[in-house]
Amino acid sequence: MEYGTSIHREDIGASLLEAKDIELEIEMIFMLTYQIDRDKQVECQTFFTQMTDEQIAGEYPEGVKQIGRWHDMPNGNGVVIVETNDQEALTSFIMSWSGMCTFPIVKPVVDDATARKLMKAMLDSQ
């Protein structure tokens, strides 16, 4: 099954879902680190500071929601946290900046509550 698809009753077995038409939409949180290309740093910073309201509103494709973005300005890198279930849309966002920077790390992350739940389940199964 690909990212961005719904999980249907027939995909995971009748015993897990009672209702025939239930769909589960899974939203994943990703942490992306970016690094501005040294030779593009001034160009990238100029573009970023001059983005219009329309450009900012349209920066992320449909299906990708920014949670936050933090910048290490002197070193030309930073972190972006997004929520999505659409791998294609996430890749499209990354590619939109590929002329000026790279995203060397893109990985799924979870919040505290989810981490505790998963750790508890892991420890309970040992």
Tell me the role of every PLM-derived stretch.
Residues 8, 13-60, 65-76, 85-88, ...:
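Short S/T/G/P-rich N-terminal loop/turn motif that feeds into the first structured element of a domain
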Residues 81-83:
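Short hydrophobic/aromatic beta-strand micro-patches
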Residues 85, 98-99:
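Short conserved AdoMet
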Residues 92-98:
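Short amphipathic alpha-helices in soluble, non-transmembrane regions
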Residues 101-111:
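Conserved short beta-strand edge segments in small beta-sheet-based binding/regulatory domains
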